[in-house]
Design a protein with these regions (language model features):
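CE4/NodB-like, metal-dependent polysaccharide N-deacetylase domain
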Residues: 98-125, 200-217
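Generic structural signal for well-ordered alpha-helices
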Residues: 32-39, 67-71, 100-110, 133, ...
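Positively charged, amphipathic and often flexible ligand-engagement surfaces
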Residues: 90, 146-161, 176-190, 194-198
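Short, well-structured secondary-structure segments
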Residues: 4-96, 101-102, 117-123, 142-148, ...
Length: 490
């Protein structure tokens, strides 16, 4: 058996519901459109793609020509569609019923638009908890991608992560593909020819090897310097041409690779996400300590050895770090329960759409990008939640005054409402007004955010980092840039 390597190459495209049209249009102009038009010219370059539901709808309406190219690539067997949660929720953070509903909604949307129902799914922010397995399996999903870091944390050796594994929860089976961290940091930042040579180096005589990549499509045009690098300087074309010219590399789909090779075995992954999330989800002081610990081991050459044990926080930590995010989340859970309790005849598609929009992950956390700190993203969640509550009250009236601990923080909240507004007061020493919602405007006037120290403040004295290794460009993870010099007034 000659030495070969299967390249499983996937890209993920997402914009949060409520994002500015100008932002989405720029993303399409610089990333989604050029990417699709480039890969279209290479029918033999098989790739996988995931679009979140709100973004997919936007592109189908505003950019039908580029979506027609994708439809043709799906039909000719070049593009493999991935599903997932329709409005890009962190599946672990929503109830089972909504996990199934969201996954099914996106699968339905893809089938209507492209004539194919996905068998693989993108896991939002690669947040893994074993509890998501039953909903994925029950929704017709057979495999997902997560980071190789997840497997390393489970004790798997890195050199074994060149194929798919199998897990189960409550006797529901799901196959797992480990995304290569090495490829995530090389593509598209290292020179194309160097990346192709790296892929070729993975080929092993007598052994089936898959090189697995699945990451944000925004790295191909939206991240700093990438538009000129990927399209102006032809990185993507050079990479594809190098892959297709290689006698060693075969572009493949996840589904066909899974059918061609047996599972590498059973695995049970710990609750985790990608490596960077472990730092971002910690409180600022602890994130500083964690970063220092990682730096110490890297400086002393022991990082790879101890990496499985150098885990930080988990995604849910954001809900304990930010009471504002926790309040949104627990209000959303309450609305989900009310929708589920309705008789089927009273439960409408509009209610489900608003519920799913309120579960969009972006406004509940933040890392490299603004997330929770962007008021228009929080506003979109609140708009959906308040509009949904208004619809629910019309068919399932509530008492005008209620007292309960909505957000599970140990304090009772008093909810006072009529047909026009709702005021929520916390029954503590401050009697703080934690929500003031207008149903006519579908707006929460109490949607504010307390200023807090963040872990990245430690970089304030750093200079902009734009120097890359190996003649490529720097990843956004390696950059520190300011709109203006930081001074005392800031």
């Amino acid at each position: 058996m000659s030495a070969t390597v299967s390249l499983l190459f996937g890209v993920h495209a997402h914009q949060p519901a409520g994002n500015f049209a100008s932002v989405v249009d720029e993303a399409h102009e610089k990333s989604y459109g050029p990417y699709l038009r480039t890969v279209y010219r290479y029918p033999q370059f098989r790739f996988s793609v995931h679009f979140s539901g709100w973004l997919l709808d936007y592109l189908l309406v505003h950019y039908p020509d580029d979506m027609a190219l994708l439809r043709e690539m799906v039909a000719r067997g070049q593009a493999e569609l991935f599903g997932g949660g329709d409005m890009e929720p962190v599946l672990a953070s929503i109830p089972y019923r909504d996990r199934v509903g969201q996954i099914t909604a996106l699968s339905d949307r893809l089938e209507r638009a492209f004539g194919r129902r996905p068998r693989g799914a993108w896991l939002t922010e690669r947040v893994w908890e074993a509890t998501v397995v039953p909903a994925l399996a029950d929704s017709g999903i057979e495999f997902v991608t997560v980071d190789d870091y997840h497997f390393v944390c489970a004790g798997q050796p890195l050199d074994a992560l060149t194929g798919h594994f199998t897990t189960e929860e409550d006797d529901r089976r799901l196959d797992l593909f480990p995304i290569s961290e090495q490829l995530r940091y090389r593509i598209p930042f290292a020179p194309a020819d160097e990346t192709v040579r790296y892929l070729e180096s993975l080929a092993t005589p007598g052994r089936a090897v898959a090189a697995i990549y699945f990451d944000d499509i925004e790295k191909f045009g939206i991240w700093p310097e990438t538009y000129d690098w990927v399209y102006g300087k032809r990185w993507l074309e050079q990479f594809i041409e190098g892959v297709l010219a290689s006698p060693v590399i075969t572009p493949a789909h996840f589904e066909t690779e899974r059918a061609a090779a047996p599972t590498r075995g059973i695995v049970y992954l710990p609750t985790t996400s990608y490596l960077e999330m472990g730092e971002w989800s910690l409180p600022a002081a602890k994130a500083d300590d964690y970063a220092a610990l990682v730096a110490h081991h890297k400086d002393h050459g022991t990082y790879d050895r101890f990496k499985p044990f150098l885990r930080g926080g988990i995604w849910r930590n954001f809900l304990s770090r930010y009471p504002e995010a926790n309040w949104m989340h627990k209000r959303m859970l309450g609305l989900s329960a009310r929708v589920a309790a309705l008789p089927q005849a009273q439960r409408t598609d509009e209610m489900l759409d608003l519920l799913y929009r309120s579960q969009a992950n972006d406004a509940y956390w933040h890392g490299l990008f603004g997330g929770l700190y962007l008021p228009h993203l929080r506003r979109a969640v609140w708009n959906a939640a308040i509009a949904l509550e208004h619809l629910l009250d019309a068919v399932d009236a509530r008492a005008p005054a209620e007292a309960r601990d909505v957000d599970h923080d140990g304090w009772t909240e008093i909810l006072l409402h009529d047909a026009e507004v709702q005021a929520v007061v916390r029954d503590d020493a401050d009697a703080a007004l934690v929500e003031f919602a207008s149903y006519a405007l579908a707006h929460n006037f109490g949607d504010t955010l307390t200023r807090r120290r963040e872990h990245y403040y430690r970089h304030m004295d750093a200079q902009e980092q734009s120097q890359a290794q190996h003649g490529g460009i720097a990843s956004a993870h390696d950059r520190v840039a300011f709109r203006h010099a930081i001074g005392p007034a800031d």
